Amino acid sequence: KIKANVIPDEKAMQKVSEVLDDPSAPLSVKVWTDKKEYREGDKIKMYIKGNKPFYVRVVYKDAAGKLLQLLPNPYRRDNDFNGGVVYAIPSGNDKFELEVNPPFGEESIAVYTSTSQLGDLDLKEEGGVYQVKTKSKDIGIKTRSVKIKEVTEGKAQQASEFFEGKAVVKTGK
């Protein structure tokens, strides 16, 4: 057996952090939760942070496979965020909480992000969020689909950047 003490290299960790926050780097968005495991009745809080301004769609998949779009939602339609800022979900005008109830098991939070507006999904309003009617396998494709918008004169066209991230949590009694 080998025993070793691991001492984190602060300079290396700082360098990695700077790269992840660099707005000139390709779009990168981190998603995480306040805990990895939740019990019945717990409230899930999630966070997102991008390295540059971005648009986001946040989709929650419960243990039964039901998909809910948390952002944008009926009360918080704006889905554009600044880079370098940590955002909590739910917060602000959100009219929902993520309370752990059966069925229990592995659940996930997926973020679909872009530097330009996102394509549309087939949604049905359900309380303070939307139920996603689009098939799970098609969400990424439809999110990245083209949105027609007017071009303002003199403004150079930029290619859109996309990023998908995911956080997985376990729920139980």
Q: Which residue stretches match the model-derived regions?
A:
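Secretory-pathway glycoprotein ectodomains that are cysteine- and/or Ser/Thr/Pro-rich
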Residues: 1-173
